[in-house]
């Protein structure tokens, strides 16, 4: 993955590239190594889409504009008769890779790069460029962050939340950001990657059981349906939840501030991707603690 590393945290303002390094040859090798072609080609189609959006300029400028990749995904899902991306077959995922590459060629006149080094430099330059995108400039003005600070770019080994039902990805907070209540909370998705949690493609599930019950009550969902379709991590992955809960407490105690954390679970193993001091709207409870 290729991520920004600005001096001051700018959540969601900068661009990120995941699954970098994939091409047809690497994909075949990963299938042999993992025995999981669905995971490999899901990662591959995600990479081509993200690279096309961020590096090659196909990301829609306005919300009203049609994302060419999303239009292709919807068409392929309709052809296969499924509603969720995660239910696409391996053949459909392979088809998406080729259709995405064709869309890039058609709209930019350039081929999708297959050399991993070319991919890497393209991604690094794109993340540096994103420092000056419209939303980042506006955010810095609001937060009083100087443009001259610039950003670093971090190149990190990937861990994968989309390797199956024992993998997941999520975001969590060590306390309630709205009122400072000492209540661990957050959202996660099984068999997904980071952007899925905030993209609205699937309904994220709650980290804690109490959070899940509160969410279901607000949404008018019965307890039976909640447990069946939207179980909390505390219920669906109890051992991972215990580890996550212990570590979020440790991180808040260490930094002496509310923590905003991102994590991935790869085949039953928990990995922290990032933690940063969160923004409390009301801090008296946190101050008392």
Regions found by a protein language model. Name each.
Residues 1-284:
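Nucleotide/phosphate-binding sheet-loop regions of phosphoryl- and nucleotidyl-transfer enzymes
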Residues 285-289:
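A short, hydrophobic C-terminal helix/tail in secreted or cell-surface proteins
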